[in-house]
Structures are given as C-alpha cells and as structure tokens.
C-alpha cells in the first residue's frame, strides 16, 4: 500500500461525507471509515437522572481484491466508554457494604472488535478474531433502541471463528466457534462453545416475511463447576408497507442445574414515513426450578425521528415487574431520550 498509516488517519479525520468515508481506494485495496456518537439522557427507578454513552464507536474496514471473486478483509472498531465498578466500604471495619457501577463517557478508548478473514463472492465470509457471531443476527421482534431484546445465543467472542453464507434466494446460514479466553488446560473454559443459525427474509411487493432460528452451546460456571449452557432461539416477522409484527422465543438450560430460562418477546413497529416511527415491545420471561420461579413482565413504548438520514433522535420508556418465588413484586421503570449522530 502506497499510503502510510499516518496519511490514512489524516484522511479519515478530514473526510466529511455523511456516509462511510472511503479514505483509500487504489489497486484493488479499499479502506472505509465510519462511526457514530450515541448518547442517552435517562432516568431509572431509585436513581438520579444520568447522561450515558450507548455504544459510540469508530470503525475501520479494509478489503483487498485477490481476484476470481476472492477478497481479504480486516475490521477494527473502537469504543470510548466503559463502566467503572465502585465499592463502598464501612469506615470502621473496611468491609464492603455496597457495590454499583458508574456509567462514564469517554473515559476509556479501547478496541471492541478486531478481526480479519476472507470473502468469496456468491459463497460467503469467513472471519477470525474478536467479533459478533451469526448468533447476534437472530431475532426479529426487537424494534427498540436500548431496552428490548431477549437473544440468549452465543452472540460474540473475543477469539471467534465465524462463517456467514451469502444470500441464496433470501436464505442465509452460518456458524461460529468461540475459544475460551485462557488456553491453559487447567483454566476454566467459560465462554467456549459454538453457535449455528439460519435466516430467511423475503419481500414480495409490500409484504415481507422473515423466519430466523439459532442454537448454541457454551461452557459456564455453575455451582463452582464447569457446565454446558444449551440455548435456542426462534423468531418470525410479518410486515406490510410500514407496519411490522415480530415474535421471538428464547430458551436456555444449564446442565445439572434445575430450571430453565424462557422468554417471549412480541414487537410491533410502524414507520409513519421515512423519518418517523413508533413502536412497542412486550416481554414475558421466567427463570428457575419449579416452585422457585422468578417471573418478569415488561412493556416498552417508544418513538424515533430522523432529523437527517445520519441523525436519529428517540424517546423510549419501559415499565417492568418482577415477581419472585415468594410472590414479592419489584418494579423497574426506565425512560430515556437519545441522540445518534452517524458519520
């Protein structure tokens, strides 16, 4: 490559395109830069109002044309904020009396995703590294900005190998294997596992239909032992013009641990026009063995509006109720106003 890294960085900063900026494109090599700043002003039950980072990022994508439909690719994504864990200790005996997390903004620039691999035209993409897996693609009912979602699959991995096929008449499939963080044979195998998924999306005129399903297994620590968590998720969506109805069901079970986790999410979204939308999500969930089950019920309402094709604003509220095995109900109410500026 004739350009230096410094030159690429300068070009990326200087780029003013509203879409992903191509900062280098020569001799079959292409480098794109894009990102977004995502902020939410929120209020939760029993907490003061707060302003938080909701995943602001800058990403760099490079591809090299190797000929015959084959290309090599690389991707890096930077994030800017991390929560800080705080412990409050008793002044006399120095014992921890309370733990909580502080949501910071711009306190920690770090690499969130980093992977490379190959893409073959008409076949698919195979990538290696810190990335989302195809399990993250499963789910159709979450139309929210930050409160919804019930995906229980192995959806990402720091050390992952992921394959995703090209689209064949609306059908896409794939799988991923995730290594544990530590290769030492004596170390815990937490997070190691695999996921497979199939996605079908088809549109005929104003009518759209989607059917998605996935299955995963991964190691977790339960009762001081390494056990396998088996999970599956299935969802379907039907849409007509600007109206869409989606339903997802997720279930997971840890080997040798009583009880299962089950969740059902129903979402309804209406695009008023190409700028405005309104939506609602309902979530039912339960967890634990028979006789000691915890049940959750949530309703989410929201609206989004695009001031520009690259500028999103939204307001979203959620009202949750959790009932434990003793019948005690705990309320969990949240509301947020958000802004996302893409570049």
Curated annotation (Swiss-Prot):
Cited InterPro entries: Gram-neg_bact_OMP, Gram_neg_porin_domain, Porin_dom_sf, Porin_Neis
Cross-referenced Pfam families: Porin_4 (PF13609)
One BP annotation, GO: monoatomic ion transport
Bilayer topology term: Multi-pass membrane protein
Chief location category: membrane
Keyword Transport: yes
Entry GO MF terms: porin activity
GO annotation, cellular component aspect: cell outer membrane; pore complex
Signal peptide: 1-20
Subunit-structure text: Disulfide bond interactions within and between MOMP molecules and other components form high molecular-weight oligomers.
Function: Structural rigidity of the outer membrane of elementary bodies and porin forming, permitting diffusion of solutes through the intracellular reticulate body membrane.
PANTHER family per the UniProt record, alphabetical: OUTER MEMBRANE PORIN F-RELATED (PTHR34501:SF2), PROTEIN YDDL-RELATED (PTHR34501)
Protein name: Major outer membrane protein
Taxonomic source organism: Pasteurella multocida
Gene (name only): ompH
């Amino acid at each position: 490559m004739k350009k230096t890294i410094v030159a690429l960085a300068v070009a990326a900063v200087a780029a003013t395109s509203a879409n992903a900026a191509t900062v280098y494109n020569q001799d079959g090599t292409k480098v794109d830069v894009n990102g977004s700043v995502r902020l939410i002003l929120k209020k939760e039950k029993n907490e003061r109002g707060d302003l938080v980072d909701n995943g602001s990022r800058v990403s760099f994508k490079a591809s090299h044309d190797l000929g015959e439909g084959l290309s090599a690719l690389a991707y890096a994504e930077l994030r800017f904020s991390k929560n800080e864990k705080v412990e409050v200790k008793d002044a006399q005996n120095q014992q921890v009396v309370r733990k909580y997390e502080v949501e910071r903004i711009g306190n920690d620039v770090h690499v969130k995703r980093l992977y490379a691999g190959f893409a073959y035209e008409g076949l698919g993409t195979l990538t290696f590294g810190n990335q989302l897996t195809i399990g993250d693609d499963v789910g159709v009912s979450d139309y929210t900005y930050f409160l919804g979602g019930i995906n229980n699959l192995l959806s990402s991995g720091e050390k992952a190998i992921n394959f995703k096929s090209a689209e064949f008449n609306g059908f896409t499939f794939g799988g991923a294997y995730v290594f544990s963080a530590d290769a030492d044979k004596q170390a815990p195998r937490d997070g190691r596992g695999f996921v497979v998924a199939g996605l079908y999306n088809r549109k005929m005129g104003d009518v759209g239909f989607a059917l998605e399903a996935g299955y995963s297994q991964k190691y977790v620590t339960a009762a001081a032992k390494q056990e396998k968590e088996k999970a599956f998720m299935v969802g379907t969506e039907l849409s007509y013009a600007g109206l869409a109805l989606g339903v997802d069901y997720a279930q997971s079970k840890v080997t040798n641990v009583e009880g299962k986790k089950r969740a059902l999410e129903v979402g309804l979204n209406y695009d008023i026009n190409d700028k405005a939308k309104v939506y609602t999500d309902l979530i039912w969930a339960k967890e634990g063995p028979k006789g000691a089950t915890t049940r959750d019920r949530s309703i989410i309402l929201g609206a989004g509006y695009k001031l520009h094709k690259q500028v999103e604003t939204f307001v979203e509220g959620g009202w949750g109720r959790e009932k434990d095995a003793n019948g005690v109900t705990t309320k969990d109410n949240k509301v947020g106003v958000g802004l996302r500026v893409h570049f």
